[in-house]
């Protein structure tokens, strides 16, 4: 009977989810991978309808130089606002019919079936999470997470975030500049990257990564032509660049789901992916529930893989964007 395999299915699902699942998703989503590896993923206890990030709106301007017998000014520091972010629940169902179970009764075949189902889930989460993390939060009738396009619009004085209007609240604006060419393709890219890096720098805190689309990435790579020797160790001509690209010592990477002509300069101190139940940044944020017996409507069992959280920001002035790159 199909239910005889349930203990095997349950244990294998749990083992796979705790093991390679999150690594395989990370490998396909550069932004998710960076958030995870840099310590920018954080836990959320799941209480309340919203998450809140405390944002400094202005620097305290009354640091006191104390004279002899002078009274200390105990006025509490002001200039803090709580910006709300709405956590979203993202799910992917895995359904296995009784017929599939009966056709895969042996342990090896059952495990192969589970791996195939989990591979589908990996690809679904990789595609979906990347789309959300770079999006504006309007897909699926607004049920998806807010992404970078919502947090960092091209025009940084337009729209609102967390109940605060950017036109009147300068502290919620991310630096944003145009990277349009003057004459030749990408002739302004390096200068704009330097500008956005410096604009987002506060002391030793600088952007940790630059993420763009494939076309801009290849344009940036083309700027390096003539600056490296295109040969391998054997002396054979190698016209492809195999090394990693960096800018000011920080990685430059590309992703599939970025809006064309965009580049984001991000800092791990200013951007967080907060996930319900997460204990450590490199832990898996995914959970699985089930099996759910679908009878009498369907002769099948279902499991549901879930991640619940939100992409949040705090120091907006240290998150930069170059748009309209050409």
Q: Which residues does each PLM region occupy?
A:
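Flexible, glycine/threonine- and acidic-rich loop/arm segments that mediate assembly and lattice contacts
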Residues: 1-326
């Amino acid at each position: 009977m199909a239910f005889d395999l349930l203990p095997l299915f349950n244990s294998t699902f749990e083992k796979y989810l705790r093991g390679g699942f999150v690594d395989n998703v990370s490998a396909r989503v550069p932004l998710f991978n960076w958030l995870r590896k840099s310590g920018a993923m954080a836990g959320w206890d799941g209480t309340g309808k919203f998450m809140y990030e405390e944002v400094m709106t202005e620097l305290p301007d009354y640091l006191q130089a104390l004279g002899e017998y002078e009274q200390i000014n105990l006025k509490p520091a002001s200039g803090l606002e709580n910006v709300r972010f709405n956590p979203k629940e993202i799910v992917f169902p895995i359904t296995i019919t009784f017929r599939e179970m009966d056709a895969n009764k042996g342990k090896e075949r059952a495990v192969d079936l589970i791996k195939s189902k989990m591979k589908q889930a990996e690809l679904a989460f990789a595609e979906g999470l990347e789309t959300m993390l770079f999006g504006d939060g309007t897909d699926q009738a607004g049920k998806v997470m807010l992404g970078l396009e919502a947090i960092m619009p091209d025009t940084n004085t337009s729209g609102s975030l967390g109940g605060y209007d950017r036109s009147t609240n300068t502290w919620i604006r991310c630096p944003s500049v145009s990277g349009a060419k003057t004459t030749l393709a990408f002739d302004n890219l390096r200068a704009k990257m330097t500008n956005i890096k410096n604009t987002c720098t506060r002391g030793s805190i600088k952007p940790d990564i630059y993420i763009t689309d494939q076309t801009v990435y290849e344009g940036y790579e083309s700027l390096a032509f003539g600056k490296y020797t295109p040969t391998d160790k054997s002396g054979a001509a190698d016209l492809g660049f195999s090394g990693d690209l960096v800018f000011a010592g920080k990685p430059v990477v590309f992703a599939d789901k970025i809006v064309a002509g965009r580049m984001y300069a991000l800092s791990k101190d200013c951007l967080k992916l907060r996930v319900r139940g997460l204990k450590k940044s490199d832990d898996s944020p995914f959970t699985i529930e089930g099996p759910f017996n679908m009878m009498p409507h369907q002769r099948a069992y279902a499991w549901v893989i879930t991640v619940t959280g939100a992409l949040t920001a705090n120091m907006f002035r240290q998150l930069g964007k170059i748009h309209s790159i050409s």
